[in-house]
Amino acid sequence: MKCFQKLYIFILILIVLMAGCESNKITGDSKETQIKKSFAKTLDVYPTKNLEDFYDREGYRDGEFKKGDKGKWVIRSEITTELKNENMVSKGMVIRLNRNSRTCTGEYFVRIVKEDSEGKVYSDERKYPVKMENNKIIPLKPIDDEKVKKEIEEFKFFVQYGNFKELENYKEDEVSYNPEVPIYSAKYQLKNSDYNVEQLRKRYNIPTKKAPKLLLKGSGNLKDSSVGYKNIEFTFIENKEENIYFTDSIYFNPSVDK
């Protein structure tokens, strides 16, 4: 009789443990879904065709902000290409939108990274100061290089045309979230038919047919719409000989730098 009682108790404990494991699995799946939905919500800034809309957009605030400071948005888009036996070339633009003064300045940049015969690496970067008025980027100084001048005139930030409405349908390789910081990240394998990939290929010379991986990183409270910073990277090729990737970032900082 005692043997039967022990067996009964053992089976009962086993059932409880199995139920607990199943419950944890469900909770985990639900959390993953919640993170993906939260990503979709915080990525609502894509697209924002009129950059001046950021003057009225609130962001995630930490202890660095002083009372009364509305903060500033820092927006950056950059394409980097390094082909076999060639220099690494990065081109992009960064602007800073001050919500207190409602003014915006920044620079367009061209950076070339070279390696000499001895393996030493050198970086040559040229910056062209710009400002934004009426949602238009305007050079602050005369530019003799017609190619650079045209690149500035035609430049669009990824936030102006990127769209993540299909995010929930993306197949993630990895998703993580730390609510205490709070920071979060997600990695996806995209297809060339993806809208954002098509837009990047339309605007940039991307010398590969390989579909990119998308990496999203950010900070801010996923329970509301505030944003601290957001990094987006489309990696087409990444190895020791060749690199092709596009990066986009949106930061919300105090208006006065330390």
Curated annotation (Swiss-Prot):
Where is the protein localized?
A: Cell membrane
Q: Name one GO cellular component term.
A: plasma membrane
User: What Pfam families does UniProt report for this protein, alphabetically?
Assistant: DUF576
Q: How does it sit in the membrane?
A: Lipid-anchor
Chief location of this protein within or outside the cell: membrane
Q: Where is the lipid attached (N-palmitoyl cysteine)?
A: 21
Provide the leader sequence positions. Answer: 1-20
Covalent lipid sites (S-diacylglycerol cysteine): 21
Q: Which UniProt keywords apply?
A: Cell membrane, Lipoprotein, Membrane, Palmitate, Signal
Q: Which family does it belong to?
A: Belongs to the staphylococcal tandem lipoprotein family.
The protein's name: Uncharacterized lipoprotein SAB0395
Lineage of source species: Bacteria, Bacillati, Bacillota, Bacilli, Bacillales
